[in-house]
Amino acid sequence: MSEIILASKSKIRLEILKKNRINCESQPSNIDEDEIKHSMIKQGASPEDVSKSLAELKANKISQKNPEKVVIGADSVIDFENEIISKPKNRDEALDILKKLNGKNHFLISSVCISKNGSMIWKCTDKACLLYTSDAADDVR
């Protein structure tokens, strides 16, 4: 049994940790991310605040169930013109998002939180400016 838990069902995040020789197990937090995002946005939260809060909520929820373990929570959001672009629910939504972002700057905001005994012990948030340019959305249809 590992001493580290990734509070996520993301296979990519788990793979990144394992490739970097961080032995861990995965336990999804199953928080309602969409509801939390919408509630925070209604209250005027920035995309950075949303990313930070989701990472912390995920880590703390799993940490409360596993107090002796170190728990990593992470979240990423796309900020386009101060609006969060959510994960597409289907192929058409994905193509619409690609068209919307094509040729325009947007930001990837990623947050990581580490919790133990149900409380945050470390956190980090970073923001990268991205420019997506492609005709792929037209080619895929």
Labelled PLM ranges:
Residues 1-70, 83-84:
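N-terminal polybasic phosphate/anion-binding patch
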Residues 17, 55, 75, 94, ...:
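Residue-level signal for inorganic ion chemistry
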Residues 29-30, 122-124:
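Catalytic beta-strand/loop signature of glycosyltransferases that borders the donor
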Residues 70, 76-106:
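Active-site-adjacent loop/tail segments of enzyme domains
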Residues 73-74, 110, 126:
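A secondary-structure boundary/capping signal
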Residues 82-89, 113, 125-131:
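Short beta-strand and adjoining strand-loop segment in the mid-core
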Residues 111, 120:
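Anionic-ligand binding region
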Residues 132-141:
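Single conserved hydrophobic/aromatic residue that forms the stacking wall/gate
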